[in-house]
Amino acid sequence: MATATYPPPPPYYRLYKDYSENPNSAPEPPPPIEGTYVCFGGNYTTEDVLPSLEEQGVPQLYPKDSNLDYKNELRSLNRELQLHILELADVLVDRPSQYAKRIGEISSIFKNLHHLLNSLRPHQARATLIHIMELQIQQRKQAVEDIKRRREEAQRLLKDAYLTLDGQ
């Protein structure tokens, strides 16, 4: 009884056998998934929406203002977090049975901090793309200048060679 070293290829490889001669012979890829889908037992959505803190069942500790100063709110939440951690240390020393309330407050502060940071991600991504594109423009301008400089140098060398050959 003979056994194969490798398993046989999947049957759909036949769909691509003429690809080298005619790239259009391959089947079109499936359309992108829209809406919700299940992956490894979890439900996911293709809409990239940040759920509000209320939807997550977490009290919002910063104002619900559209003109929110993220920097100041992050600083104040950070200070509040430090204060609550110190209070937790005091509670653990004096009243160890009441630590659960402090842990819940610290958890709420962390969730608010993370929500604020996650709401800044689109702005950060946009700024990163702008920076990358500016770098690409700068690199391309430098490449064009380098090409011009090398072209002028090549023209000068050709002119010198022509004059040298013409003078002999």
Swiss-Prot record:
GO terms for biological process: de-etiolation; regulation of transcription by RNA polymerase II; regulation of unidimensional cell growth. Keywords: Coiled coil, Nucleus, Transcription, Transcription regulation. It is found in: Nucleus. Residues 64-92, 132-166 form a coiled coil. SUPFAM superfamilies: Mediator hinge subcomplex-like. GO terms for cellular component: mediator complex. GO terms for molecular function: transcription coregulator activity. Component of the Mediator complex, a coactivator involved in the regulated transcription of nearly all RNA polymerase II-dependent genes. Mediator functions as a bridge to convey information from gene-specific regulatory proteins to the basal RNA polymerase II transcription machinery. The Mediator complex, having a compact conformation in its free form, is recruited to promoters by direct interactions with regulatory proteins and serves for the assembly of a functional pre-initiation complex with RNA polymerase II and the general transcription factors. PANTHER family: MEDIATOR OF RNA POLYMERASE II TRANSCRIPTION SUBUNIT 7. Belongs to the Mediator complex subunit 7 family. Component of the Mediator complex. Interacts with MEE14/CBP1. This is Mediator of RNA polymerase II transcription subunit 7a. It comes from Arabidopsis thaliana (Mouse-ear cress). The lineage of its organism: Eukaryota, Viridiplantae, Streptophyta, Embryophyta, Tracheophyta. The gene is MED7A.
